[in-house]
Design a protein with these regions (language model features):
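Extended substrate-binding grooves/exosites of carbohydrate-active enzymes
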Residues: 1-168, 172
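Short "domain-exit" segments at the C-terminal end of structured domains
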Residues: 174-179
Length: 179
C-alpha cells in the first residue's frame, strides 16, 4: 500500500472526514486521497478528474503543498488518449504535478464465442440480454485488452512513460546538465 484511497464519485461529508481521521490515526506513514475533498477537504493529494492542461499548470504553480495526481485522466475510450503528450509536458515541468490514473487501464470484457461467426470475441453488458446491445465501448475502453494484449494507444502511453529524467552537474565546468 502506497496511498490510502477513500474512493471517488461518492459525495463528501462527515463520514469521509471521519474515515480520513481514522486512517491518519491508524497509519501516518502514507497519504490519504479522496477526489471529492477537492481543495479544502480532508485529502493529502489534490486528485481531481479530467482537469484541463491550463488548470493543471495553474495549480502546479500555486503554493498549495498538496501534490496533484489526477484520479482519472486521459480517457482511453476507443483508440483515443489524445492530449497525453501535453499532460506529460506539464508533469515533467512541475514536480508538484505527479501524474494520474488512466481511465480505463484494462478493458472489462468477457471472452465468449460469437453466436453468428463462432469466432472468439469480447462481450459485456447488453450482449447478454439485460439491456439493448450496444456498439459503444463503455466497458472495453482501456489501453490493455481483456486478453492483456496492448491496444494501439498503449504504445503512446509507453512512449511517454519510457523516459528516465535526471539532472546532474558537470564537475569540470560547474554547469547544470539536463537530459
Amino acid at each position: 500500500i502506497i496511498v490510502w484511497s477513500l474512493g471517488n464519485e461518492a459525495g463528501y461529508g462527515p463520514n469521509f472526514e471521519k474515515a480520513y481521521d481514522w486512517i491518519k490515526s491508524y497509519d501516518q506513514s502514507r497519504p490519504v486521497q479522496y477526489e471529492q475533498a477537492r481543495h479544502d477537504g480532508k485529502t493529502d493529494i489534490f486528485c481531481p478528474m479530467y482537469m484541463g492542461y491550463e488548470d493543471c499548470e495553474k495549480y502546479a504553480q500555486t503554493d498549495n503543498p498538496r501534490p496533484l495526481i489526477q484520479c482519472e485522466y486521459a480517457h482511453a475510450m476507443g483508440n483515443s488518449i489524445g492530449g497525453f503528450k501535453e499532460y506529460w509536458d506539464i508533469i515533467r515541468k512541475y514536480p508538484k504535478y505527479q501524474g494520474g490514473y488512466i481511465w480505463d487501464f484494462v478493458d472489462q470484457g468477457l471472452r465468449d464465442k460469437s453466436k453468428i461467426t463462432g469466432r472468439e470475441i469480447f462481450t459485456y453488458g447488453g450482449d447478454y440480454g439485460r439491456y439493448p446491445a450496444s456498439d459503444n465501448n463503455f466497458n472495453c475502453n482501456g489501453i490493455i485488452a481483456p486478453d492483456r494484449r496492448l491496444n494501439p494507444h498503449a504504445y503512446e502511453v509507453r512512449y511517454y512513460y519510457q523516459n528516465v529524467n535526471r539532472r546532474s552537474e558537470e564537475r569540470r565546468v560547474g554547469k547544470e546538465c539536463r537530459s
